[in-house]
A protein has these predicted regions:
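Conserved acidic segment of CheY-like receiver
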Residues: 2-23, 57
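Acidic phosphotransfer microenvironment of two-component signaling modules
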Residues: 13, 40-44
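Short hydrophobic/Thr-rich beta-strand motif most characteristic of the beta2 strand and flanking loop
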Residues: 27-40
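CheY-like receiver
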Residues: 44-129
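Conserved binding/recognition cores within well-folded domains
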Residues: 119-202
Length: 202
């Protein structure tokens, strides 16, 4: 698995340190292939992201000079597809934040603890990110295909072959293999066996 680069940005250095620990604990449940870098200003974060992109950014909204929304706008204007999770004490900003396509929104002063909320969000995030991984399928006629997991609708077993039905393709990709091998290969991606010949992608 490729190491994830995670950024945390908050102008409050005490909160920044606390968030780093909470985020570390939440991700450690699923993987050790990640690094967390912290930034006390939006400008510092954007500069670091330009040098080497982050996949996940936890971003305080209410910061001086360059706000979290300013940072998010720059990221989206540059066509960055990173996952943004806004963190703020101002719940009224949740609707405005939707303009920047955030993955989630964490309230600092919510009744649910930040730790509990973070745990839920990271679980959801890890499941979502798995769907953006690619697999290589070898069709006996059309050759090799790199396919996103989320584009696989379902898999059908037919004699000694597997038919992969892919979003946007009229004909399935036909790869040699058994449904048992397929089950083991895609177990971590939340595929479900609904029949002895079929696996569907949830």
């Amino acid at each position: 698995m490729i190491q994830m680069r995670i950024a945390v940005c908050d102008d409050n250095t005490v909160m920044l340190s606390r968030l780093k620990g909470i985020i570390y604990n939440a991700f450690s449940v699923y993987t050790d292939e990640f690094e967390i870098l912290t930034y006390s200003s939006g400008a510092l974060l954007l500069n670091a992201h330009k040098q080497e992109a982050f996949q996940i950014i936890f971003l305080d909204i209410d910061m001086p000079k360059v706000s979290g929304f300013d940072v998010a706008k720059t990221l989206r204007d540059d066509f960055s597809n990173c996952f943004i999770i806004f963190i703020t004490s101002h719940s009224e900003l949740v609707y405005e934040s939707m303009d920047f396509q955030p993955f989630h929104f964490i309230q600092k002063n919510c009744e649910i603890s930040i730790e509990e909320n973070m745990s839920r969000i990271v679980k959801k995030l890890m499941k979502h990110m798995k769907q953006y991984e690619k697999v290589i399928l070898e069709d006996k006629e059309s050759g090799r295909h790199a396919v996103y997991i989320h584009d696989i609708m379902y898999i059908e077993s037919e004699k000694h072959y597997l038919n992969y039905y892919i979003t946007g393709r009229n004909a399935p990709i036909k790869e040699r293999g058994s449904i048992k091998e397929c089950e083991e290969k895609y177990e971590r991606y939340d595929f479900v066996k609904i029949h002895k010949r079929y696996l569907i992608n949830l």
